[in-house]
């Protein structure tokens, strides 16, 4: 973590789920470990999973294989992982436990925004950029529920795309 940066003070309960559910994902600008700049515009048009984790978090590491399986199952979703750890720290961990999400290292923007103090936390965002689900902790029930919701979000994307094509065709033929 960069010197002078601190996580917000408070218990895990400070996560403001109710404040964010159903709201647009806010504007942001962050760099991933490959130096790509990400903004809100990059997440519009396809669902997104944002996972909060850190290298010393056992539950975070235990859920990584399940999160990786989501990537295989739903390839048309954007997968971001954010941590306050450095890129070098992330690299050491993902060599032991692969975690294929796009990594945003040494960054507290999302932590402060959502008031995250306990991890893991996962946020699901729909293709319009609306926050549909936020959950802290891990476990089989959470991962199963979130996987089902992600399946619906991914199907919603395909279904609406097909409807958009149909309505455009109908307008052209009218």
Where are the regions that the model predicts?
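Short pre-active-site segment immediately N-terminal to redox-active cysteine/selenocysteine motifs
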Residues: 46-48, 53-56, 86, 118
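Acidic helix N-cap motif at the loop->helix transition within catalytic regions
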Residues: 89-92
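Thiol-/selenol-based redox modules, centered on thioredoxin-like
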Residues: 7-19, 124-174
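Short, internal strand/loop/helix patches
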Residues: 80, 94-128
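Conserved redox-active cysteine motifs that mediate thiol-disulfide chemistry
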Residues: 52-69
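N-terminal "domain-start" segment that seeds a small globular fold
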Residues: 4-40
């Amino acid at each position: 973590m960069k010197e002078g940066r601190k996580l917000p003070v408070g218990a895990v309960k400070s996560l403001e789920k109710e404040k964010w559910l159903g709201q647009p994902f806010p504007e942001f600008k962050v760099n991933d470990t490959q130096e790509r700049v990400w903004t809100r515009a990059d997440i519009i048009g396809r669902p997104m999973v944002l996972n909060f984790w850190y290298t010393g978090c056992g539950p975070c590491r235990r859920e990584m294989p399940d999160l990786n399986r989501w990537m295989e199952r739903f390839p048309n979703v954007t997968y971001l992982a954010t941590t306050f750890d450095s890129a070098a720290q992330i690299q050491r961990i993902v060599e032991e436990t692969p975690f294929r999400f796009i990594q945003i290292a040494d960054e507290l923007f999302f932590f402060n925004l959502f008031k995250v103090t306990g991890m893991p936390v996962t946020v699901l965002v729909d293709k319009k950029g609306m926050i549909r689900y936020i959950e802290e902790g891990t476990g089989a029930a959470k991962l199963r529920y979130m996987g089902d919701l992600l399946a619906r979000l991914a199907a919603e994307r395909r279904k609406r795309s097909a409807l958009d094509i149909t309505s455009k065709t109908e307008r052209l033929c009218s």
